[in-house]
Amino acid sequence: AAPERRVVLAALGPKMLALSAAHADGALPYNVTPEHTARARGIVGPGKAIYVEQKICLTEDAAVAREVAAKQLAMYLVLPNYRNCWLRLGFTEEDLSGQGSDRFLDAMVAWGSEATIRARLQAHFDAGADHVAIQPFDPAGGTSPDWNALAVFAPGD
């Protein structure tokens, strides 16, 4: 038998989330917080899948983590769909100005100890996510994924 295949919509706002509930197998929100995941679950309902993405940076140095976060989020800060989503989540224009406030950067990129990052991933599951995809940023600022973080959070076999 053929494997089950699901088609989900990339969805941030309430209209796209409702569309994903009505016409797809679920939603894939990107650049979101666990609070957004809870809102998304409320809109798409219990019978649809929610696959979220969470950026991570395995470092306990706040300055390093925020520098990496600011670099990685810069291209999204100018896009209206993401800005509107973040404003709906309670961020302010001030939070989204420049490279983003510490509050914004900390909300978008989980950083800290392994336990701290695992708690953020769990917060998405607790909020209704079916799957959480991690995007591990290199604390050294490299363009490749942080292979150490992958070994910790997605060890495979």
Language model regions located:
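Active-site-adjacent structural elements that line small-molecule/cofactor binding pockets in enzymes
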Residues: A1-D157
